[in-house]
From Swiss-Prot:
GO terms for biological process: translational termination. Responsible for the release of ribosomes from messenger RNA at the termination of protein biosynthesis. May increase the efficiency of translation by recycling ribosomes from one round of translation to another. It is found in: Cytoplasm. Belongs to the RRF family. Pfam families: RRF. This is Ribosome-recycling factor. InterPro entries: Ribosome_recyc_fac (IPR002661), Ribosome_recyc_fac_dom (IPR023584), RRF_sf (IPR036191). GO terms for cellular component: cytoplasm. NCBIfam families: frr (TIGR00496). It comes from the Bacteria. CDD domains: RRF. GO terms for molecular function: ribosomal large subunit binding. It comes from Streptococcus pyogenes serotype M28 (strain MGAS6180). Its main location: cytoplasm.
Amino acid sequence: MANAIIETAKERFAQSHQSLSREYASIRAGRANASLLDRIQVDYYGAPTPLNQLASITVPEARVLLISPFDKSSIKDIERALNASDLGITPANDGSVIRLVIPALTEETRKELAKEVKKVGENAKIAIRNIRRDAMDDAKKQEKAKEITEDELKTLEKDIQKVTDDAIKEIDRMTAEKEKELLSV
């Protein structure tokens, strides 16, 4: 039963890491990356639809994204969604495809993005600590219900803290890696 609490916490930590990884992938680092467009929703026939379901996204050059809509009639909707997004990149529509030229990051923009990375990393740490709190509460409930002894509770709490520390170290590593990527020219 005690192992189930730790396994559940580990699974939730892994989900947090995956979520953080996706979040970091969508923060542009001066290079074209199709994951920059993962959060773009296009109003397609009145329904919000993810861009990657309406078009193929390729990277023909280091700083260029090429969006080729499956349905050419959706090109205006896609362009409208890109203009409305917070990417800060103006799409170039040539009638059949849309080109996004990723501008080189200025020093100021790099620092702003690094701050954003730290903020996102801090939010991930908060999520990890909330998961730890839930696991500790579950352990205390088991001890109250006399399913585990007080000594087992102390051991379980130490184990939960150890996996929590490991999860936070991983977040710190991911954050430092993304910051390094952003700040290197």
